[in-house]
Amino acid sequence: MNVHKKPSLKLIAIILVTFSVATGCKKSEEKKQEIKKQETVYASDVIPFFEHWKLILGDGTNVGVPLNFENKDYFYTENDGENNWVVFKAPNGGNTHGTSNNTRTELAQLKKWYPKTANEKMTATLKVMNVSATGDETVAATHSVVVGQIHSADKHENEPLKIFYKIYPGHKKGSVFWHYEINTKGDDNSGRWDFSTAVWGHDFSIVGPSADEVPDEPKDGIALGEEFTYEVEVKNGIMSLTFKSKGHETKTFTKNLIESEYLTKADIPKQTQELFFPIGQDGVERKNAYEGEGCFFKLGAYNQTNGKSPEVNRNWCSGAETFNGDVAKQYKTGNYVEVWFKSGSLKISDKVVSNEGYFSKNDKVK
C-alpha cells in the first residue's frame, strides 16, 4: 500500500517564498525596463518644434519627421548637468544628401515660403562642441560647420544664408560669421559665390599662410562649448539677423533678398574678388535676387570639412582625413562636427506652401 505524505507546512512556505521572489524579480526587471523606457529623452522632448521639419542624417538618409526619434551615431540628446541638449553630429566623409560634397545631420523645413510675402522667423541657442581636427589650413571651409541656413528650393537651390562657426587647431577662440550666396543670373550656376560677414572673430576669408600653418587667433571669438543665439527673420523681402552671446556685443544685420546689389562684376566685393575670382567663380546676380523662389530654413550640423582634394576647389575642398568613410574611426580621431542645441523656435506664416518637391529631388544617397 502506497502512503502519500502531505507536504509539510515548512515545504509549502519555502515554495511560496521561492515563487514570490521569482515573481518579484520578474516584476522588478519589467519595472526597470519600463522606467528606462520612460527616461529616454528624445530631441522632440527638449525642443517642441520637430513636427515642422524633416531630418537628414550624417549618412545621407532622410528619416522624415523626427518625433520620438534618436540615432546614437548622429542625433540624440545629452544632459550637461543643468540642461538637456539636442546633439547633431556628422563625420568628414560619408554619404551626402542631394548634390552636396559634405555630410550633415540637419533639419530641413517641411514648408517653403517666398521672401517678398514672407513673415517667417527661426531662432536657436547652441554651442559647438567639435569641428574637424584635420584639413588644409589654406582652405577657407576647413574646421567649420554651418549651424543654420536659409535655402532655396527652386532653380539653382542656392543659399541666401549660411551661419558658420569655425575654429583652428590650437586656438581657444573661434569665429562666427554668416554668408550670403548670390542667386546667379542665367542657367549656369558655376559662377556662384559667397560674401562672408564676421559676427564675432574673423570672416571666412581669413586662412592659414600654408597647408599646415594656422592664422592668428581672433581676439573677440567664441570658444568651443560657449553658447550663442541666433535669430533669423524674413519679412517683406528683408532678412534680419541678430546674434547674442553672454560677454559679447550683440550684433544685428539686414539683407535685401529681393533686390540685388551685385548686378555687374564691378559691384562684386573685394573679398569675393580675391577669394572666388581665382577659381572661376565670378558670376553676377539676378536683378530681383531670390524673389519668386521658395525658400526654407535649415538647422543643425552641416559639416564644411571634407576629404576632397584642395586642387578641386581651393575654398571648399579641405583634403581632410575621412578614413574612407569609416564613421567610428572619424569620431575616434576628431574628424567630425558636433553641435548641441538647447532651444529653438519657428514662426510660420499662413503664406507657406509644401516643400515636398525639394525632398523628392534630393532624397538620394550618393
Regions found by a protein language model. Name each.
Residues 2-12:
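Bacterial N-terminal signal peptides that target proteins for export
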Residues 12-20:
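Bacterial N-terminal signal peptides
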Residues 20-40:
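Bacterial Sec-dependent N-terminal signal peptides
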Residues 36-69, 355-366:
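Extracellular carbohydrate-recognition regions
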Residues 47, 119-121, 133-137, 221, ...:
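Ligand-recognition surfaces built from glycine- and aromatic
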Residues 75-190, 365:
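Secretory/extracellular carbohydrate-interaction modules
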Residues 122-124, 226-235, 239-243:
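Short tryptophan-centered beta-strand motifs in secreted/extracellular beta-sheet-rich domains
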Residues 181-228:
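Short, aromatic/His-centered strand-loop micro-motif at the edge of beta-sheets
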